[in-house]
Swiss-Prot record:
It comes from Enterobacteria phage phiK (Bacteriophage phi-K). The lineage of its organism: Viruses, Monodnaviria, Sangervirae, Phixviricota, Malgrandaviricetes. This is Major spike protein G. Pfam families: Phage_G. Keywords: Capsid protein, Host-virus interaction, Viral attachment to host cell, Viral genome ejection through host cell envelope, Viral penetration into host cytoplasm, Virion, Virus entry into host cell. Disulfide bonds: none annotated.
Length: 187
């Protein structure tokens, strides 16, 4: 009753279009994607409350990323990244939410090229009125592939039908360095 299981550990996809059904039309971002951060991006966990006015000019192909710097000290290169998203969008834009990994020489990147991200799909639900929520975990390589780079993971929101307006909600990401075993109560 108290135990939550990790649903999937997906591998990164790099496609020009994500496969989805229904009226949602996602597009893989191509230009520079803005990295939205309120204050500093911290290591190991980030909780960001968004209250932003985004315009079509603010985002690349209707995308933005909320990211955190990864702790690269564990010897094991594979680490679980947990993400929880609950967002409300003004207008009729329904984004696709996923976890991304990218590297940057900067400690506080403000944008990243769409071709340099690795996208990990996560399960999400979309409600009426531009509301979406997602909660899932993925396994990510936390060691830099180029010497001197910092590794960042975060949540990307993409939509081909992006409309200007407010984005409200919370995005939480956590790097799980140690796995804990949850004990079940005896019956």
């Amino acid at each position: 009753m108290y135990q939550i299981f990790v649903t999937k550990h997906d591998t990164a996809i790099q496609t020009s279009r994500f496969s989805v059904t229904g009226s949602i039309t996602p597009v893989a971002p191509t230009g520079n994607i803005p990295v939205i951060n309120t204050g500093n991006i911290t290591a190991e966990h980030a909780v960001v409350s968004l209250y932003a006015n985004l315009t079509a000019g603010t985002s690349s192909d209707g995308s933005f990323i909320v990211a955190m710097k990864v702790d690269t000290s564990p010897a094991d290169p594979n680490c679980v990244i947990s993400a929880g998203v609950n967002l409300s969008f003004a207008g009729t834009s329904y984004p696709i939410v996923g976890i991304v990994r990218f590297e940057s020489a900067s400690d506080q990147p403000t944008s990243i090229a769409g071709s340099q991200i690795e996208h990990y799909p996560i399960e999400m639900s979309v409600g009426s009125g531009g509301v979406c929520s997602a909660r899932d975990c993925v396994t990510v390589d936390i060691h830099p592939r180029a010497f001197g780079n910092n590794v960042f993971v975060g949540v990307i929101c993409s939509s081909a039908k992006w409309t200007s307006g407010r984005v409200l909600g919370t995005i939480a990401t956590t790097q799980v360095i140690r796995e804990y075993q949850v004990l079940q109560p005896l019956k």
